[in-house]
Amino acid sequence: MRLRARLPRATSGDYLAGLGQSTVEEVDAVVVGCGPAGLAAAVELKRRGFDRVVALERREAPDEFEVAKAYLYLVDRRGQRWTDAVGATDGIRARGVSNEGFSLTRIYPDEKGIFPTKPVLARPGAAQAVWIPRASLLAALAERAAHDGADLRFGVSVDGLCAADDGAVDIACGATTRRTPLVVGADGARSRVRDFLAKELPASSFEPRELASPSAGLTYKMLQVPPSFDVTNKTDGSRFTTRSRDAYTVPSRSTKPNTRRLRLGLLPSRDPELPRTANIIRPANHEIWGCATGAEVREFLRSEFPQLPDAVVSDEACEAFAIAEPGAFPSPQYVETVAATVGAARCFLVGDAIHAFPPDLGQGVNAALEDVKTLGDVLDDQNAVAAYQAARAPAAKAIAHLVQRGFPYQYDQSVWRQRLFTVGLVGRVAANALAAKLLPEKIATRVAPPPAAFSVIDGEDYVGVWKHIKRATRATTALAVAVLARAVI
């Protein structure tokens, strides 16, 4: 998509002069942002023959441990299509934990004790998926990108972007400006690259289209705990030692829906030396968010989690939790334009810059890696911008809608709605199984497709899954109307 001409417009020379900058570094490609999508894009650009590839990131290092961002990724079949293509899967497996045989151990505060359960979304298609901490994945991708010759610049902030006089794009970073004919915006939901493109096209094509979701707006913080620790089995008073490689959920003493009930979630981590965090995800009015000091956090934990000795959470961790700013899940969202041409420069958006959503289906990193794989596949195409737009804009829209419906009540925000959703999920599974026995595969998929969450986790095409869901919804609605009409008659 070529951008329309804009007159008058300041030249890059005017822009640089205004900033007092004079050093211009000409490169073949610039990636803005060194999260998973950006580092993967740097690897892909080098793989596709680009010589001078620069990736810019404001953080000081790729693998900094940040408690507020100490979540884990599940790199599934979709994400592994890219890691397989570049030979990075084994390195990621070496730093992660396989999802094969995944189970979740529940550690209750009462006589229910401790026992393993099978998660609802533990799919056979995700058996080879890999759990890996964010810092570990970033380190693996950064090492690969640097090994391949990408120039990773950490501790560098982007001050602005503008069209250069020669048709390229200038990216101002302090005293240096990178001039490039190819830009990849991997800089998140508040993308500077996307904002730059919005100045050149009608802004509406780059404005996120937000969808309502029961999990949107939920507030979260991370509570640091040791990689392994002892808890009390309230059934018999015995000690139980957790392992870093296993997953746990720790329900609170309060069980009725109220502003004290919550659960701690711990996902598996391979490295026993890496700090571990427990996820706390609750609505904004929950009492835990009112704990303003470490002492108040400690009092809350003692009251609600008698199965956890004080030693599990240090005083420092309690204080850090109290003063940390909470995060909030975004609404599922997407943008309609994911690539454009500025002058002679090609600009592409990947990852959260084109689609963002709550982590309900674990698709953030996988959708981003699929973006990067598609980008690499079309780069040699003379019409790469149009080809990428045609492939990823529909995918971004589809995954946003799928997350909206996939598994939004898993955070215990409404007991009765969660149960109602689970009944519907079981019903869709049963209908799909029955249709598969009675009808040819293609017809069965049209009439009663498997739940959207299952198809997404199994690695099926986002757009195809969304089409099946919409078609089945229309068929179900038509059937319900027909039955109602017949009953009235």
How should each PLM-predicted stretch be described?
Residues T23-V27, D76-M222, G294:
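Conserved N-terminal helical subregion
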Residues G20-A37:
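Beta1/beta-strand and adjacent pyrophosphate-binding region of the FAD-binding site
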Residues D170-P326:
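Conserved FAD-binding catalytic core of PHBH/FMO-like flavoproteins
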Residues M1-A17:
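N-terminal mitochondrial targeting presequence
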Residues R270, A284-T374, L379-D380:
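FAD/FMN-dependent oxidoreductases across multiple families
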Residues G13, Q21, E319, D377-I489:
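C-terminal helical "tail/cap" subdomain of flavin- and related membrane-associated enzymes
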Residues A37, A41, A61, R190:
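Conserved Rossmann-like nucleotide-cofactor binding loop
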